[in-house]
Amino acid sequence: MSSSSAGAAGAAERAWVLPDEPLPVRLMSTIWADADGPHDDLRTTADVDDWLDAVGVDRAGAHATEAELTTARALRDAVRLLAAHVTADDRPGAAASANDVAAALDQVNATAAALPAPRLALRDGRLELGPPGGPSPVTTGLAQIAEQAAALLGGEDAGRLRACYAPGCVLYFVKTHPRREWCSVACGNRVRAARHYQRARDRQGDA
C-alpha cells in the first residue's frame, strides 16, 4: 500500500469522518478526544490532504501548502469557537469573549472571501465573463467550507447545532432527530453505561 493510500485508509477510521454531518461540523471534529486525551488531526499538510480527500473535496491533484495548513487550522478553530457561542457550550475550555467571537467571524469571512469568481474580460471588442481565476483547489475548498460554515452558524440550522455532552467528548453535531442527544452511537452508549454504573453504585450505597 502506498503512503497516500495508507493515509487515506487511516483517515477513514478517524473520529471526524461523520458522513451525516455537514462539512463545517466535520472540520470541527478534527479536534477530538478519547481516553488518551485530546487529539488534533490537522497537524501537517498531508493531514489536510487526507482530510479533504476523506470528506470529498476535490484537490485536483494539488497538495496543501504550509500557508493552507495554517488557514485550515485557523478556520477550524474559528468555527469551533463560533459553534460554542451559538450553542452556549459550557464544557471546560469552550467559553469565549466577545473579542474572540469577533476575531473568529473575521477568520471565517476572510477564508470564504477566497472563493474564485468569474472575471470580466474584453474579447474582440465585447465584454464577456471569463472562467474564474484565483487560488489553488485546496484554498478554494477551504473557502467553500467557510461559506458553508457561515450558512450553518447564521442560518436556520444554527438552532439545531449542539455540543455533545457525553463524558470527555469535545465534538458538535446537527440535531437531525428530536430524540438525538449525542454526536454518535458510541457517545450515547458511553452515557448509558455511566448512568448504569452510577445507579449500581447508588443501590450498593443504599444496601
Named regions from a protein language model:
Residues M1-A163, V170-Y172, D206-A207:
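Short helix-coil boundary/hinge micro-motifs
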Residues A166-G168, V185-A186:
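Short, cysteine/histidine-rich loop/knuckle motifs that typically chelate Zn2+
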Residues P178-R190:
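Cysteine-rich micro-motifs
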Residues G168-F173, V191:
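Cys/His-rich microdomains that often coordinate metals
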Residues R26, V191-A194:
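Alpha-helical elements of the RecA-like P-loop NTPase motor core of helicases
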Residues R195-A207:
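Contiguous alpha-helical segments
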